[in-house]
């Protein structure tokens, strides 16, 4: 370790700053600058996506049963809107759950940053 730096004008050593010699094999990089922080998992968004997925699947099943006649409450005039709403609710839930699954498994190109987070 080198001695502390002296002020050239007064010749008084500065005790606040300590210098040390770098090793000859050091290339100026430290390991911490290459480490990634662990990803922040958006639990609220994944819970919402799960809810959308389940509600959408339920509405698609009910709409299909209404359309096929197993549930006889109005027929096709009620089945088509239920199917459309079920599909519109199911698709975003499925999409975000797929991203969350692939991000959790570490697939290339998928990360939790692709899922919108609701932590305001």
Swiss-Prot record:
It holds the Pfam family TMEM_230_134. The chain crosses the membrane at residues 46-66, 79-99. The keyword Transmembrane applies. The modification Phosphoserine is found at residues 15, 23-24. One of its GO terms (cellular component) is membrane. It is a multi-pass membrane protein. Its main location: membrane. Involved in trafficking and recycling of synaptic vesicles. This is Transmembrane protein 230.
